């Protein structure tokens, strides 16, 4: 199919609630514009038997829905992409699913589009999912919307119905920042106002859908007018004599001899060479994929950002961002994730959930967690500084995803609003005495020994005996026990999932400080969630976190019940008790597993001490 020769490429998506006719609309548009081949048309006719009674028996949604499950259920599940072109323009359209459970798919499509065709069923008006898709489109940086009021052939007094829906959306979308909203009444099934103007709606004097798409001022090509942004995607080292930084020029322009700054380090250099597949060039424009070499030995690597001497990006390790949550498990502030921004990976924590957005009213409400498909404004903290622009200024350098550490699933999509200025005023103080020097004085290697298991499993009993044994051997230790910490430092926390996460986060930071003093730190905490235990591990150097799973069966813990807590939990007087009405996630690969039903506490403590000897943490 030949490329259009008019305004260039337009990326747009169709979105809206389920059964509003998104796939049918795209199929009809392609059909009426003469962009469907004969063999595709014949295949659609065969597949439409028993499903369509008009227009030659064609179900136009079949021209877009590609998955077998989509065709069987007459719904869209995955995002379907189609390229097409007219004499005036070329297009890439993304057909997004309407079901709430597939909102994450819609968000993925929206992140690469510059215009949204938001469908509304004329019979139903604005629905919750319609509003949710409008919010997601706005958050993803889409500034131009076509409000396509579909199925106009199924309503009486269409002009009044259309006007009411247009007014309702105008009021709802006012805070969303759209630069243009064009409302078009249409019938995808019959082709009214899709490509050709409809005689059935003589009161509509605006454009057809295709006519508007061909002329919409919603370009999404990289711009040379913006500040220089070159994202390093990989370091090119074909031999010992060449080291290049390969990536895509997102905006601005590059030229040999030009000054650049590498972020987040802030080191400066000049462009020595610009290398392409066809050889060296002296200039590169926005959108070009090139390899550049620098005239100085500047530390620059994958995930770094190059800018010009003017227009530097923001650099911070704390920032505010809108977050679209995509996982079944809710977002809990304090939990650690992996954050990917461009080609850079860094551990990150959502430190605060400032508010959640009500998709019906756009009101901001207090929330302690963020559920599936919910949108909220959060504060995030990263383990290392990031270079970025606000998402409003650049989608490429202002977006990120959050990834679960265990499943490697993408759980959230983020749009950065601004850095938290308080972070810019904090600087890590270099200490005169190092951790290594403190540890050498004590003849030991600092580490965290983390005892995890159900209440009543024997964690504290074994940890106390391990500490006594280490003290006898002349080692310097500190014991942190769950109840003791909750009586002081964490007395403000309860036992909800969010409070449990914060409890372990604080303990992890305290334990880290104690290892910097050269101590062997013994922590006896239920710590029911794997993610939090792994977050503590990530705070420490490799080999400095040893997980000891005190693996006592629940029935045995209930039988022991040394504090009477299980009896209270089973009677309903104690809520959120681990093992009864709150989950416990056992370690997958602990450094040591202890079975308290097979050996006594002294023998198990000796096994722990032997582990420390083998690891070189404590001398025998």
From Swiss-Prot:
<dbReference type="InterPro" id="IPR009000">
    <property type="entry name" value="Transl_B-barrel_sf"/>
</dbReference>
<keyword id="KW-0511">Multifunctional enzyme</keyword>
<dbReference type="GO" id="GO:0000103">
    <property type="term" value="P:sulfate assimilation"/>
</dbReference>
<dbReference type="GO" id="GO:0004781">
    <property type="term" value="F:sulfate adenylyltransferase (ATP) activity"/>
</dbReference>
<feature type="region of interest" description="G2">
    <location>
        <begin position="74"/>
        <end position="78"/>
    </location>
</feature>
<comment type="function">
    <text>Proposed to provide activated sulfate for transfer to Nod factor. ATP sulfurylase may be the GTPase, regulating ATP sulfurylase activity.</text>
</comment>
<comment type="similarity">
    <text>In the N-terminal section; belongs to the TRAFAC class translation factor GTPase superfamily. Classic translation factor GTPase family. CysN/NodQ subfamily.</text>
</comment>
<keyword id="KW-0067">ATP-binding</keyword>
<keyword id="KW-0536">Nodulation</keyword>
<dbReference type="InterPro" id="IPR044138">
    <property type="entry name" value="CysN_II"/>
</dbReference>
<protein>
    <recommendedName>
        <fullName>Bifunctional enzyme NodQ</fullName>
        <ecNumber>2.7.7.4</ecNumber>
        <ecNumber>2.7.1.25</ecNumber>
    </recommendedName>
</protein>
<feature type="region of interest" description="G1">
    <location>
        <begin position="16"/>
        <end position="23"/>
    </location>
</feature>
<comment type="similarity">
    <text>In the C-terminal section; belongs to the APS kinase family.</text>
</comment>
<feature type="region of interest" description="G5">
    <location>
        <begin position="187"/>
        <end position="189"/>
    </location>
</feature>
<dbReference type="InterPro" id="IPR011779">
    <property type="entry name" value="SO4_adenylTrfase_lsu"/>
</dbReference>
<dbReference type="Pfam" id="PF00009">
    <property type="entry name" value="GTP_EFTU"/>
</dbReference>
<comment type="function">
    <text>APS kinase catalyzes the synthesis of activated sulfate.</text>
</comment>
<dbReference type="InterPro" id="IPR044139">
    <property type="entry name" value="CysN_NoDQ_III"/>
</dbReference>
<dbReference type="GO" id="GO:0005525">
    <property type="term" value="F:GTP binding"/>
</dbReference>
<dbReference type="GO" id="GO:0004020">
    <property type="term" value="F:adenylylsulfate kinase activity"/>
</dbReference>
<feature type="domain" description="tr-type G">
    <location>
        <begin position="7"/>
        <end position="223"/>
    </location>
</feature>
<keyword id="KW-0808">Transferase</keyword>
<dbReference type="InterPro" id="IPR054696">
    <property type="entry name" value="GTP-eEF1A_C"/>
</dbReference>
<dbReference type="InterPro" id="IPR009001">
    <property type="entry name" value="Transl_elong_EF1A/Init_IF2_C"/>
</dbReference>
<feature type="binding site">
    <location>
        <begin position="16"/>
        <end position="23"/>
    </location>
    <ligand>
        <name>GTP</name>
    </ligand>
</feature>
<dbReference type="Pfam" id="PF01583">
    <property type="entry name" value="APS_kinase"/>
</dbReference>
<dbReference type="Pfam" id="PF22594">
    <property type="entry name" value="GTP-eEF1A_C"/>
</dbReference>
<dbReference type="InterPro" id="IPR027417">
    <property type="entry name" value="P-loop_NTPase"/>
</dbReference>
<keyword id="KW-0614">Plasmid</keyword>
<dbReference type="GO" id="GO:0070814">
    <property type="term" value="P:hydrogen sulfide biosynthetic process"/>
</dbReference>
<dbReference type="GO" id="GO:0003924">
    <property type="term" value="F:GTPase activity"/>
</dbReference>
<keyword id="KW-0547">Nucleotide-binding</keyword>
<feature type="region of interest" description="Sulfate adenylyltransferase">
    <location>
        <begin position="1"/>
        <end position="444"/>
    </location>
</feature>
<keyword id="KW-0342">GTP-binding</keyword>
<dbReference type="GO" id="GO:0005524">
    <property type="term" value="F:ATP binding"/>
</dbReference>
<dbReference type="InterPro" id="IPR050100">
    <property type="entry name" value="TRAFAC_GTPase_members"/>
</dbReference>
<feature type="region of interest" description="G4">
    <location>
        <begin position="150"/>
        <end position="153"/>
    </location>
</feature>
<feature type="region of interest" description="Adenylyl-sulfate kinase">
    <location>
        <begin position="445"/>
        <end position="620"/>
    </location>
</feature>
<comment type="subunit">
    <text>Sulfate-activating enzymes, NodP and NodQ, may be physically associated.</text>
</comment>
<feature type="binding site">
    <location>
        <begin position="95"/>
        <end position="99"/>
    </location>
    <ligand>
        <name>GTP</name>
    </ligand>
</feature>
<keyword id="KW-0548">Nucleotidyltransferase</keyword>
<feature type="binding site">
    <location>
        <begin position="150"/>
        <end position="153"/>
    </location>
    <ligand>
        <name>GTP</name>
    </ligand>
</feature>
